[in-house]
Amino acid sequence: MQNRNIFSWVKEQTTRSISVSIMILIYVITWTSISHAYPIFAQQSYENPREATGRIVCANCHLANKPVDIEVPQAVLPDTVFEAVVRIPYDMQLKQVLSNGKRGSLNVGAVLILPEGFELAPPDRISPEMKEKMGNLSFQNYRPTKKNILVIGPVPGQKYSEITFPILSPDPATKKDVYFLKYPIYVGGNRGRGQIYPDGSKSNNTVYNATAAGIVSKIVRKEKGGYELTIADASEGRQVVDIIPPGPELLVSEGESIKLDQPLTSNPNVGGFGQGDAEIVLQDPSRVQGLFFFFASVILAQIFLVLKKKQFEKVQLSEMNF
């Protein structure tokens, strides 16, 4: 009886351990897939998202060129919170190819490269009106040491094709490396999935070309989607197998003669990446005060001139009457 109880206890503990192990494994796999699906591959591969040529590195994976727009104030005062509005326009009716080959809505993402000293505004400095414009977005620093570079995404494009960044301007009085100057701001924005992964491999959201010339001798439709094409290369007497993942639409058929690099599929990509820039002036408050003083003095001078002119006209009129 005692041996039976011990056996039951051991069986129960073993079952529990296996269940916990499976749960941990599922969590690790899920977490890894989510993190790798996050379109911040640039953070993993590049210290700075903007190359010396001015090109933003997101364009290495998102090959199609699409527009993006940024709107910022012409000038801001030190230690002031302002809005940087990034617009990523696209046709909301479009559906993109997902990693499993099915169709789904497009996500969007953006990277905002601010001047040194500018950074994401703290929550207690953001007004309720600005929070309402931001929605439920959560911004990140590109690097812990690069607070002036912000990233966001992927987020649903139908809800966030216009993204409001809350920015805090620096104060040269407390930051000695910041000056009252005109500064550039750079932005990159993408809609939809990329065509190339950071390791150089293709996603299923791009065109697949023939890796050899010859005759398509066999096409096998795979159980989980996609195709396996066998190309008979008569010139070299060999067979080449091209694997096409689920998503792209096949354009060739068995028995068809194809050339090297000929497209085997359609291009399913409906998204793309764009970059833009803007300028902002960090304005010295004393200059603003001086400008107001100048305008006030000009207005007063004009008033005095008008009064003096009227007084002179009255004197002339009285002399004529006399």
Curated annotation (Swiss-Prot):
Q: Where is the signal peptide?
A: 1-35
Q: Which SUPFAM superfamilies match?
A: Cytochrome f subunit of the cytochrome b6f complex, transmembrane anchor, Cytochrome f, large domain, Rudiment single hybrid motif
Q: Give TM segment ranges.
A: 288-308
Keyword annotations for this protein, in alphabetical order, are: Chloroplast, Electron transport, Heme, Iron, Membrane, Metal-binding, Photosynthesis, Plastid, Signal, Thylakoid, Transmembrane, Transmembrane helix, Transport
What Gene Ontology cellular component terms go with this record?
A: chloroplast thylakoid membrane
**Free-text remark on how the cofactor is bound:** Binds 1 heme group covalently.
Which residues are involved in binding heme? Y38, C58, C61, H62
Q: Name one GO biological process term.
A: photosynthesis
Which Pfam families does the annotation name?
A: Apocytochr_F_C, Apocytochr_F_N
| Superkingdom | Eukaryota
- Please give, as recorded in its UniProt entry, the membrane topology of this protein: Single-pass membrane protein
The cofactor(s) it depends on are: heme
What GO MF annotations does this protein's record show?
electron transfer activity; heme binding; iron ion binding
Q: Give the UniProt subcellular location, in the record's own words.
A: Plastid, Chloroplast thylakoid membrane
Q: How does it assemble?
A: The 4 large subunits of the cytochrome b6-f complex are cytochrome b6, subunit IV (17 kDa polypeptide, petD), cytochrome f and the Rieske protein, while the 4 small subunits are PetG, PetL, PetM and PetN. The complex functions as a dimer.
- Role summary: Component of the cytochrome b6-f complex, which mediates electron transfer between photosystem II (PSII) and photosystem I (PSI), cyclic electron flow around PSI, and state transitions.
The entry's family comment says: Belongs to the cytochrome f family.
* Stated name of the protein: Cytochrome f
